[in-house]
């Protein structure tokens, strides 16, 4: 992984020529073009978006496996209790993740997925480009705090898995047989468990003031809305911008909790 910095841009370095020469001299090494150019954050793609795309550029085209799903652009392996992991496990699918890869061969298997999924906003661009390059489907299922949005994401994932099953005529009856009633039952169970956990947390935290930072989650306003709806004493949210994905939460907070402070991170 080679990181170029602001100085390379100031000096007008011919980076294409540099990488070409490196590839010629060391053909056995794959050089990934990474970026550390904060001066360019305000225009176009951010360094984070470009890096998350670059991490998957070495993947080569493979025969798609309809029973494999690759999670793109995440920093950590999904927890075993995550919705996506449990759903895929129940339908006989294999989930592949970059942080779980230990060898180059395992890394290359990421490209064998029939479906790519991304959950982190800065990963969406790279996942779109990867899916287009390898001629696959990409589902953007962002982490969120609204039950109905989560429900629709679950439906979208299962619908795409069933479509892949149908196209390839596989024998994956577990996925094909999932009904709307079963999805609804799964959803209701998850909501109940979530509500129980939130209420348990509230019984411990009580009226202690809560301050949120956008570095914890890309949807801090959605989290603030969830907590306030459940009686938590959220006082401040630190963030430098408001994502379009957060507009419904922002509008709700403005109407129901106009006293909530939104502060720029420079004010910490």
Stretches with model-predicted labels:
Residues 1-268:
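An N-terminal assembly and electron-transfer interface module characteristic of large anaerobic redox
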């Amino acid at each position: 992984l080679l990181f170029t910095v602001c100085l390379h841009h100031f000096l007008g370095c011919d980076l294409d020529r540099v990488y070409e020469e490196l590839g010629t001299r060391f053909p056995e090494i794959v050089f990934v073009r990474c970026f550390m150019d904060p001066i360019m954050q305000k225009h176009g793609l951010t360094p984070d978006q470009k890096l998350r795309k670059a991490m998957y550029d070495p993947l080569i085209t493979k025969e798609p496996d309809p029973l494999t799903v690759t999670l793109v652009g995440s920093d950590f392996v999904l927890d075993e209790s995550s919705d996506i992991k449990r759903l895929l496990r129940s339908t006989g699918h294999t989930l592949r993740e970059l942080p779980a890869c230990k060898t180059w061969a395992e890394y290359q298997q990421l490209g064998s997925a029939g479906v790519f999924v991304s959950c982190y906003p800065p990963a969406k661009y790279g996942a779109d480009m990867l899916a287009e390059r390898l001629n696959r489907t990409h589902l953007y299922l962002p982490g969120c705090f609204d039950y109905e949005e989560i429900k629709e994401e679950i439906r979208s994932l299962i619908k795409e898995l069933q479509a892949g099953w149908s196209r390839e005529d596989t024998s994956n009856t577990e996925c094909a047989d999932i009904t709307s009633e079963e999805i609804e039952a799964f959803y209701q169970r998850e909501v109940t468990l979530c509500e129980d956990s939130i209420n348990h947390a509230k019984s411990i935290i009580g009226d202690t003031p809560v301050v949120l930072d956008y570095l914890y989650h890309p949807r801090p306003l959605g989290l603030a809305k969830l907590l306030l709806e459940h009686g938590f004493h959220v006082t401040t949210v630190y963030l430098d911008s408001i994502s379009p994905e957060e507009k419904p939460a922002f509008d709700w907070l403005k109407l129901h909790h106009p006293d909530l402070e939104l502060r720029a991170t420079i004010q910490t």
